[in-house]
């Protein structure tokens, strides 16, 4: 029997917040409540995340800290049959920022926040465990920025994005030969980039009028080189293919000697030879599965190109109390044509993604109910990058719509904000191939994520 290969279908595909691709846009409670439509003005040090050029608006040292919690779920269907629910539990996405004015019109800023994230979890016995049982990705950016006010109306900034990127996945891989699965190998693939990869960003803000301002932010590609380890162990053997193959082999051998069904010796000879060859074939197959699992154990590596993006936005003060904003983000997810995993033995795998570029559009409004209390709300439409015939169960298919409300309260030098949002995922479907080459239809429905956030700022 030939060597059996583990079909490792590891790939990177969904986010904790059900955002398109695996990008995260939750930089602060106020930013969440306004749908990211804060490109033209800064309120706190989270400007490091949304548009660092607006750091020039801040006077004095400002420290901003907080977190967003996410809980995504979805009902999944495989080949038209109800399957296990996707429910990874609750994730916490912390953020921390500082802004410090400097002489000669400069402002220094530093942001620490997750830019990328993934979290999916299925029951270990769900029908696509060969694709994934659970996957977690963390992409945390350490982002120093320097803003400069060229004039009272125009400011610019430049920054470095030092990225820590980690990947962790459990799956039940197929041990495959000639299109047949002979067993299941429990696989645990993990790794990170050691925080050695970086990119950059540029932004600008211009006050068109006293009430209208515009902002733009560009983020570069980041090429991440992930190194880690692949752990394997045999979960179970599948002898169904062996039984079928031995049966056909014995029948062919008997027919070659003129013994076919109906011959008086057929049943006796069939049982004799079947018993003889079946045991040997099973022992050999089990040995090959064990060898395949052992060969896949060891150091692993992968390369991932994080996409470039461009965000543009406007902010308009309708009155002294009513403020409107919009933000549009283009992300070049098409740069992720495929992901190449370098695994021990002969188990290297190229996972085709062929994603589409996406647009994310947000509209936000804020109303100053009192001098200290502001009410906020927003709506976001977020495109799904997946193509119908390329994908994995880690990314339930479908565009996202997000509705968020929130408030901000000024108390002395403190600025406290909180938000709550619902992420609605449109039901859709895609096709995934298993290790034998068979195609399966994955459908999602009732996709929903709860997103709650709180952020506190202090002005020194």
Where are the regions a protein language model picked out?
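Surface-exposed strand-loop-strand hairpins of Gram-negative outer-membrane beta-barrel proteins
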Residues: 36-43, 72-90
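Outer-membrane beta-barrel porins/channels
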Residues: 20-32, 78-82, 91-460
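Gram-negative bacterial Sec-dependent N-terminal signal peptides
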Residues: 1-19
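Outer-membrane beta-barrel pore proteins
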Residues: 39-61, 98-103, 150
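Transmembrane beta-strand segments of Gram-negative outer membrane beta-barrel proteins
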Residues: 24-38, 56-73
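Residue-level signal for pocket-adjacent positions within structured domains
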Residues: 17, 29-36, 43-45, 50, ...
């Amino acid at each position: 029997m030939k060597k059996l290969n583990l079909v490792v279908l590891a790939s990177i595909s969904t986010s904790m917040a059900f955002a398109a691709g695996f990008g995260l846009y939750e930089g602060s409670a106020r930013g969440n409540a306004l749908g990211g439509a804060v490109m033209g003005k800064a309120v706190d040090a989270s400007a490091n995340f949304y548009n660092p050029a607006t750091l020039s608006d801040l006077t004095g040292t400002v420290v901003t800290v907080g977190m967003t919690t996410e809980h995504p779920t979805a009902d999944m269907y495989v080949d038209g049959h109800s399957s296990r629910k996707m429910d990874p539990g609750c994730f916490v996405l912390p953020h921390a920022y500082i802004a410090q004015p400097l002489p000669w019109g400069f402002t220094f800023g530093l942001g620490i926040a997750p830019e990328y994230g993934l979290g999916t979890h299925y029951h270990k016995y769900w029908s696509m465990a060969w694709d994934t049982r659970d996957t977690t990705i963390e992409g945390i950016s350490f982002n120093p920025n320097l803003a400069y006010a060229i004039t009272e109306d125009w400011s610019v900034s430049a920054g470095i994005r030092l990225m820590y990127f980690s990947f962790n996945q459990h799956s039940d891989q197929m041990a495959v030969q000639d299109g047949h699965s002979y067993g299941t190998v429990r696989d645990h693939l993990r790794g990170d980039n050691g925080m050695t990869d970086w990119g950059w960003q540029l932004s600008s803000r211009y006050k068109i009028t006293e009430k209208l301002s515009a902002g733009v932010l560009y983020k570069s590609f980041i090429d991440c080189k992930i190194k880690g380890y692949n752990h394997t162990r045999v979960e179970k053997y599948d002898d169904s293919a062996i039984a079928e193959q031995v049966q056909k082999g014995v029948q062919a051998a008997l027919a070659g000697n003129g013994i076919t069904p109906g011959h008086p010796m057929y049943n006796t000879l069939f049982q004799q030879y079947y018993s003889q060859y079946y045991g040997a074939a099973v022992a050999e197959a089990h040995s090959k599965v064990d060898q395949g699992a052992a060969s896949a154990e060891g150091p692993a590596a992968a390369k991932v190109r994080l996409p470039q993006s461009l965000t543009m936005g406007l902010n308009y003060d309708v009155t002294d109390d009513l403020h409107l904003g919009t933000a549009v983000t283009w992300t070049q997810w098409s740069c992720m044509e495929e992901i190449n995993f370098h695994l021990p033995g002969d188990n290297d795998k190229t996972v085709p993604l062929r994603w589409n570029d996406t647009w994310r559009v947000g509209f936000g409004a804020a109303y100053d109910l009192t001098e200290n209390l502001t009410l906020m709300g927003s709506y976001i439409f977020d495109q799904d990058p997946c193509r119908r015939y390329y994908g994995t169960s880690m990314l339930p298919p479908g565009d996202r719509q997000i509705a968020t409300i929130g408030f901000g309260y000024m108390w002395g030098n403190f600025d406290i904000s909180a938000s709550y949002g619902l992420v609605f995922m449109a039901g859709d479907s895609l096709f995934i191939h298993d290790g034998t080459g068979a195609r399966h239809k994955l459908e999602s429905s009732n996709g929903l994520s709860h997103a709650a956030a709180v952020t506190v700022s202090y002005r020194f």
